[in-house]
């Protein structure tokens, strides 16, 4: 039996509606995964999509860093981070640290919907684990 994928879902305020639509599109797959998300995004995913989500703090309060820590410990298989490139973020250093951690640990990190869709397809089809291919 394949292991359950562990996926982090994060969305900036102006991208939260996009995240909800994305999660609804991929709900069948996401329900077979262990999900973690920053606070507000996780709450909306639970309430509006009906997904079971481990909620971290909100991004500006350290949620991005909490996800980054789990990623560094090998407990995250992919990050879907719908960023708003048009709005400055007060916690930009935390965001950069999370994306850097994805690069350092060779974890897929989708920052737009097109890439997020491709990551979902790849995770659904991947045997073996994508991280093991380039180890």
Swiss-Prot record:
Keywords noted in UniProt: Lyase
Gene Ontology biological-process annotations: methylglyoxal biosynthetic process
Record keyword Lyase present: yes
Protein species of origin: Ralstonia nicotianae (strain ATCC BAA-1114 / GMI1000) (Ralstonia solanacearum)
Domain of life: Bacteria
MGS-like domain location: 1-135
Similarity remark: Belongs to the methylglyoxal synthase family.
First-tier enzyme category under EC: lyase
PROSITE patterns for this protein: METHYLGLYOXAL_SYNTH, MGS
Name of the featured protein: Methylglyoxal synthase
Stored NCBIfam families: MGSA, PRK05234.1
High-level lineage: Bacteria, Pseudomonadati, Pseudomonadota, Betaproteobacteria, Burkholderiales
Keyword set includes Lyase: yes
């Amino acid at each position: 039996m394949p292991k359950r994928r562990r996926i982090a879902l994060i969305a900036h305020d102006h991208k939260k509606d996009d995240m909800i639509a994305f999660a609804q599109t991929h709900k069948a797959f996401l329900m077979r995964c262990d999900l973690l998300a920053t606070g507000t995004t996780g709450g909306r995913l639970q309430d509006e999509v009906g997904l079971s989500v481990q909620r971290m703090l909100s991004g500006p309060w350290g949620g991005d860093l909490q996800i980054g820590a789990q990623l560094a410990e090998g407990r995250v298989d992919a990050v879907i981070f719908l960023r708003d490139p048009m709005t400055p973020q007060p916690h930009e250093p935390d965001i950069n640290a999370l994306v850097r951690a994805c690069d350092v640990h060779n974890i897929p990190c989708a920052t737009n919907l097109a890439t997020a869709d491709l990551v979902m397809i790849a995770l659904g089809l991947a045997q073996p684990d994508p991280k093991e291919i380039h180890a």
